[in-house]
Amino acid sequence: MENQREEIELTEIPETEKKRTAEEKLLSCSAETAEEKVSLCSEETTDTSSSSSSEQTPAPIEVNVNIQTSTYLPQNAATNLNSLYTSFEDARAQGKGLVRHNSDDLKSFLEKYPPDYRKPKRDLSESWDPGMPKPTLPPRPANLGASQASTVRRHVREQNFKQLRERKANEGKIVKDLKRLEYKVNIILCLVVVILAIILLLTGLSILFIRIKS
């Protein structure tokens, strides 16, 4: 029995080896065919792309441009962006006609402007071009006179606004109370005058009645 089992196992080994070799051959053939297809497709795409690029790409145009003066900038130009940037203060002064911007001026904001640059007194002799005309002063306002001048009235600070409002409210209340008192006093005086007139009439009539009887 043992000899028969060994013979069966020996007969099975060459069959499995044949199957493995057949599978390996199939895999190698499929890989070779796939590589050939990919190479053919890549060659076709390269041919079409080269032909289309040769048809579409125009000849390069040489342009001589001064980067600092012109607004046109070619591609892939090595330019310093700070030379093309104007700060807000420079643009505002340039719009007012005070300063002519210089693109070579690459100083920082703190170096260019001192801490007290917002004050009205500022020396513009360094940045002023002698060829530029001086700005004309605005026309003087008309003389409004003493009655219409803004400095005639007394200026009050904001801290005293509450006190002034309270004073005005108290004054209004006092005026109303005085008016009420005047009205009451007038009514009382009128009543007194009417009573005195009635008394005088009664006394006169009584005197006349007594004389008539006598």
UniProtKB/Swiss-Prot annotation:
Domain notes: The SH3B/LBD1 (SH3-binding) region binds LCK SH3 domain and CSKH (C-terminal Src-related kinase homology) region binds the kinase domains of LCK. Both motif are required to activate LCK.
Extracellular-side positions: 208-214
Subcellular location: Host cell membrane
GO molecular function: SH3 domain binding
Renumbered residue ranges of the record's region CSKH/LBD2: 104-113
The protein's name in its UniProt record: Tyrosine-protein kinase-interacting protein
Residue spans, topological domain Cytoplasmic: 1-186
Membrane topology: Single-pass membrane protein
Biased composition (Basic and acidic residues): 15-26
Transmembrane segments: 187-207
Residue(s) carrying Phosphotyrosine: Y72, Y85
Physiological role: Plays a critical role in virus induced T-cell transformation. Binds to T-cell-specific tyrosine kinase LCK SH2 and SH3 domains, thereby activating its kinase activity. Once phosphorylated by host LCK, forms a complex with at least STAT 1 and 3, resulting on the phosphorylation of STAT3 and presumably STAT1, and their migration into the nucleus to induce transcription of target genes. Stimulates host ILF3/NF-AT-90 activity. Association with host NXF1/TAP transduces the signal up-regulating surface expression of adhesion molecules as well as activating NF-kappa-B activity.
Principal location class: host cell
Spans annotated as Disordered: 1-59, 117-151
Keyword annotations from UniProtKB, A to Z: Host cell membrane, Host membrane, Host-virus interaction, Membrane, Oncogene, Phosphoprotein, SH3-binding, Transmembrane, Transmembrane helix
Miscellaneous comment: In its host, LCK protein is inactivated, preventing T-cell transformation activity.
Comp. bias (Pro residues): 132-141
Residue segments, region SH3B/LBD1: 132-141
Practical applications according to UniProt: Used in cell biology research to transform T-cell lymphocytes. Saimiriine herpesvirus 2 transforms T-cell lymphocytes, including human, to continuous growth in vitro. 2 viral proteins, Tip and StpC, are essential for this function.
